[in-house]
Each structure stands twice: as C-alpha cells, then as structure tokens.
Amino acid sequence: MNLQEKIEDLRKRTLSDLLSVADEKTLNNLRTVMLGKKGELTEILKGMKDLTNEERPVIGALANAFRDEFGAKFEAKKLEIEQAVMNAALESESLDVTLPGKAQKKGSRHILTQTQEEIEEIFLGMGYEIVDGYEVETDHYNFERMNLPKDHPARDMQDTFYITNEVLLRTHTSPMQARTMDAHDFSKGGLRMIAPGRVYRRDTDDATHSHQFHQIEGLVVDKNITMADLKGTLDLVMKKMFGQERELRWRPSYFPFTEPSVEVDISCFKCGGKGCNVCKHTGWIEILGAGMVHPNVLEMSGLDSSVYSGFAFGLGQERIAMLRYGINDIRGFYQGDVRFLEQFD
C-alpha cells in the first residue's frame, strides 16, 4: 500500500474502534496509539521522505484532515462517555425528596458590632453624625493636632506602631476631631459627631489589654457648649447602656487635648455601689475619659476659642461589652471561638 492508502486504512480502523469505546481511559489510549508521538500515523508519515515534492503536500493535507476529523469525533465521544457516567450515577443514587433538608445555622453579628450599633443608635437619636477615619494616620493628626507636639512628654503615655517617621497606626480615634472640624462648615451650625473604629497600641496582649481594640470618639463643638452639656450627654448615654438607676462620678484627670479633663466612673451595676469583685469593692467602675476641647485644638482648626467651645469623650467598645456581659478576658473577642461568640446570638 502507498502512503495515501495506509492513511485511509488507519482512518477507517480508528473511527471504527472509536465507535466501540465505552470509557475515558480506553478513549485516551486509542488517541495515543493512533496519533501519539510513537503512534501509527507518525510511523506512516516517516515515509514522506521518499515522496516527490508534488506528493508531499497531498499526503500532508490528508494526514491533517484525518487529525481534524478524529479530534472532533474524539471530543464528541468524550462528552458522550461523561454524560453516560453521570446518568449511571444518577440512576444508582436514590434521592427521597420528601425527607427534611439539613437545617442551616444562621450567623449573627459579632458582640462588638452589636455594642457599636447600639451606641450609634443612641447618638443618632441625639442628632449626631457618624464619621469614619483612617487607621493609618499621620503623626500630625494623631499627635500634633491633638495638642501633642513632638517634644510633648505625654506622648510617652501611648506606645505607638510607627510605619515611617511621619506615618503610624492611630493610637486613638481622636484624629477625627481635627479632620472633621477642618471639613465642617461652622457657618451652617455646630458639629456633633462620633467616630467609631479600630486603634492600635504597643501593648502586650493579656486578659485586659490588646494591641488592637475599638474606640468611639465623640465630639461636640458649637457656641456656648459647657461642661453641663457633657455631663448631661454622658449621663443619658450611660443610663441607656447600663440602666436608669446608674449614677456617674466625675474625677479630675489629664488629657492633652481637653481642659479640664475628667475620668467618668459608673456606679457598679452588680452590687449597686456596696462593693464587690467587679468594682474592686469601691462601688464604682471606671468607664471613660472626657473633657472640654482644649482651646489649642480649636485654634488649630481655625476656630476662635473665645467664640466656640466643645466637649469630647472616648468610649472603649470592648470595655463596655465586658462590663455589660461579664466577660473577663478581652482576648475572647478576637479568637473566633464559636463557643464564646454564640452566647451573644
């Protein structure tokens, strides 16, 4: 037989064998035997070296046509086998559609998210706006605009994660005070805002400390804002969070960005002020820091501190959640232990 006859014979045998193939392994073996590098077609085409220049294109075109035809029929056969395998599996696997399905367990919001949303709802009801800020902050806004110049000794109060000399992970949400005052148009009225978010300190993680935690900054700036406004606001918020019978105690303190500054304690909700292990037998629990916005902070935002005044405060979400729900280890918020989290579904 000449090469043309050999290719035609190979074509007929290959297509005939293809019809009887019943599984994918046999199908792949057939392709290898007939068209592989060491297959029959390759052996036949080795004889092209003995052909004339006129005969070679004819044989080459015939071989290519055979490859194309086999390729199309190969893919069709492969699809047929896959469909047959699927049909057989469906027939062998019985499914009783009347059986009840598997119940899907609903997820829930994280306890810190629940706490934040509850606090936000209180302040929204009081006419506050909620603003978001940068977790990667500049030294200028994190410290200098908060009345903490580079040589200020109070910078030692906060161990900071620096990214560069001028860029850091914010140590508090207070930078949003300056950023919001810069953007606010005071000719249209005063400013009332809260800024929730993550903050970072170089603390060693233990039961009461974390290198990352959540803080809600509050700020009110307008004409004729007084300490009485601050006291009334926090009294309302704390009673909504911890119960109407709670009382607040105000202690002098120091924060560079407020003057005067105060620490606010809440009467113990477990013992009613009699003294217990929760309040360390004092009857009071430290809950937040606050104060009147320092005149320097106002002036750096372009406000006349003789005309405008304001108050600011900082709430720790983890601390509030721990006190409300009797949680004694802050690490539980971040470890993703379902046994802990599902208590607050």
From Swiss-Prot:
CDD domains: PheRS_alpha_core. Keywords: Aminoacyl-tRNA synthetase, ATP-binding, Cytoplasm, Ligase, Magnesium, Metal-binding, Nucleotide-binding, Protein biosynthesis. InterPro entries: aa-tRNA-synth_II, aa-tRNA-synth_II/BPL/LPL, Phe-tRNA-synth_IIc_asu, Phe-tRNA_ligase_II_N, Phe_tRNA_ligase_alpha1_bac, Phenylalanyl-tRNA_Synthase, tRNA-bd_arm. Pfam families: Phe_tRNA-synt_N, tRNA-synt_2d. GO terms for molecular function: ATP binding; catalytic activity, acting on a protein; magnesium ion binding; phenylalanine-tRNA ligase activity; transferase activity; tRNA binding. SUPFAM superfamilies: Class II aaRS and biotin synthetases, tRNA-binding arm. It comes from the Bacteria. It catalyses: tRNA(Phe) + L-phenylalanine + ATP = L-phenylalanyl-tRNA(Phe) + AMP + diphosphate + H(+). Its cofactor is Mg(2+). Tetramer of two alpha and two beta subunits. This is Phenylalanine--tRNA ligase alpha subunit. It comes from Lactococcus lactis subsp. cremoris (strain SK11). The gene is pheS.
